[in-house]
Structures are given as structure tokens and as C-alpha cells.
């Protein structure tokens, strides 16, 4: 099974994304299953993980409205009001009717509190996620996010955490050593996973190629191993610096150069197992 472990849907005419600015012109519009399907077919991608794009209920409802009718969407990473444990529990009970619910994400980098994820109310909700066997995805952007992720991993050993986009390695800068040290600290916790995704949009040049990705991919494989790494296109965000074909083909080439014997795991098997894409629903996971 080949899995694109990180993609989005949105219709900005229907749901306004707070982070969308004039600089995002190429992706300001409608990006739904019919647009993505040909690219998935061209690369023989069997399943995707659909990920939230905004911190509110309407975005999550919109995702499920689409995902429930699309066979190749294998899992959904939803949004829950983690800062309100009571409402979080109620909302989770509502969303449990959707068989593809597997994970939760909050855009922590948009919060004014730099350590929002460590607030007592949020921690109470994270305990609920662990109890409910939901994955927590983290859009790690700043050094503090790495440190908070490592602390959460130690505090909730039963909670599976996923670092999106490898924590945005500063490709081509003199801060790569700092990034490597931070992500290795997170990877030392066996309940932390990562996605090799979104790397092309961390590069300012339009003429990026596979050589720009090699160092980040090599470090990721060395510290996580292939059984805790996944690959994602980050479509349509990726369109800001490359089309789907270029992004996916370059990721595959990087994996085949660095770890050809592990490419199958990273390109699908790890995501299949972590998100339990073969299970009929989250409620069935772990049933004896």
C-alpha cells in the first residue's frame, strides 16, 4: 500500500482560512477530491491521510463531508477544542460516528501563548486523546515546539504523537545542526513519529531538487527509523513551490537514494499501521 500521509481539502469561498493571505494566491480557491484524484492515480497511491486546515469545527465538518464519500481517504486528522476539556469530550462523541477519525491536530503556531499545548486544560484533553486511542499531530515550527513535544511524549507514553513536515528543517541555512539536535531529542521517545512532507515549501528557491532534501531525509531516517516515518505531499500547500508530480517524485527519489530497502515502509506501510487504515473504524482498533 502506498499512502500520501498528509494532504488537505479546502474551499476558501465556503470556509475562510484565517492564515490565508494574498501571498497564497496559488492555493486560494477550491481544492477537493476531484482535483487530487488524477495525481494519486498517476502515482498509484492507494490511500491518503486528510488533515485539518483550521482551528474550528466547520473545517472538520467539511472534511468529513468529503471524506465519508471518498474511498481513497483512509484517515482524517480532525480538530477538537482541546482548550475546553468538557466541550472536547462532547465534540469527540459527535465525531465518533465517522469511521475515518484517527487523529487530532491544532495549529499551535497560531496561538499567542508560545506553550499553548502545555496548558492544564489542553493536557486534560490530551489525556482523553490517549484514552480514546487518537493520534496527536503537531505542526512543529519553532524550537519550543520540539521541546514541548518531547515533554508530552514523556508525560503521555501511551499517546502517539506525529511531527508534521519533520518540524520544518531550515534547509540550506546554518541552523540545520540546531534542528537536528531538537528532532533527535523528540525521536528518542518511541511514541513520536514524523512525516517527511512540506519540505519544498521551506525552500525559497523555485529550482529546488532532490539534493536539497537528502540531508533532512538522511537525518530523519537515522533518528526515527523507517517504522516511525511517513511520506506526505502536503497538497495543496505544496503547490506554492512545485506541482504534485514534482513533489512526490522527488520524495520517492530521495528515499530510494538514502534508504532503498526502507522506502516501502516510509511510503505506505508505516502510515497504514499507525493510522490503522485496514481497520473499519477507530472503535474496532484493538478489539480482541
What would you call each of these model-derived segments?
Residues 58-72, 156-162, 213-222, 244-254:
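Short, electropositive alpha-helical surface patch
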Residues 31-36, 58-61, 87-90, 146-147, ...:
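Alpha-helical scaffolding within the catalytic cores
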Residues 116-230, 284-288:
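Catalytic pocket-lining loop regions of alpha/beta-barrel enzymes
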Amino acid at each position: 500500500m502506498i499512502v500520501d500521509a498528509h494532504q488537505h481539502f479546502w474551499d476558501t469561498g465556503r470556509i475562510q482560512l484565517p492564515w490565508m493571505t494574498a501571498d497564497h494566491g496559488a492555493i486560494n480557491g477550491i481544492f477537493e477530491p476531484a482535483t487530487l484524484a488524477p495525481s494519486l492515480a498517476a502515482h498509484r497511491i492507494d490511500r491518503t491521510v486528510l488533515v485539518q486546515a483550521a482551528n474550528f469545527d466547520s473545517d472538520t465538518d467539511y472534511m468529513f463531508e468529503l471524506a465519508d464519500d471518498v474511498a481513497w481517504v483512509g484517515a482524517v486528522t480532525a480538530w477538537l477544542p482541546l482548550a475546553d476539556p468538557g466541550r472536547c469530550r462532547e465534540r469527540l462523541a459527535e465525531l465518533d460516528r465517522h469511521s475515518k477519525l484517527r487523529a487530532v491536530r491544532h495549529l499551535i503556531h497560531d496561538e499567542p501563548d508560545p506553550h499553548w499545548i502545555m496548558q492544564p486544560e489542553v493536557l486534560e484533553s490530551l489525556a482523553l486523546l490517549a484514552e480514546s486511542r487518537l493520534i496527536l499531530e503537531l505542526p512543529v515550527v519553532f524550537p519550543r515546539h520540539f521541546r514541548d513535544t518531547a515533554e508530552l511524549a514523556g508525560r503521555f507514553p501511551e499517546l502517539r504523537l506525529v511531527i508534521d513536515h519533520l518540524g520544518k528543517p531550515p534547509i540550506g541555512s546554518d541552523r540545520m545542526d540546531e534542528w537536528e539536535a531538537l528532532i533527535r531529542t523528540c525521536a528518542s521517545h518511541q511514541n513520536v513519529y514524523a512525516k517527511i512532507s512540506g519540505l519544498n515549501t521551506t525552500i525559497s528557491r523555485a529550482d529546488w531538487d532532490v539534493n536539497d532534501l537528502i540531508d533532512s531525509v538522511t537525518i530523519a531516517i537515522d533518528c526515527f527509523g523507517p517504522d516511525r516515518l511517513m511520506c506526505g505531499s502536503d497538497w495543496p500547500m505544496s503547490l506554492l513551490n512545485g506541482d504534485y508530480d514534482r513533489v512526490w517524485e522527488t520524495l520517492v527519489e530521495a528515499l530510494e537514494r538514502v534508504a532503498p530497502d526502507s522506502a516501502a515502509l516510509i511510503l505506505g506501510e508505516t502510515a497504514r499501521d499507525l493510522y490503522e487504515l485496514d481497520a473499519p473504524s477507530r472503535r474496532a482498533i484493538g478489539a480482541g
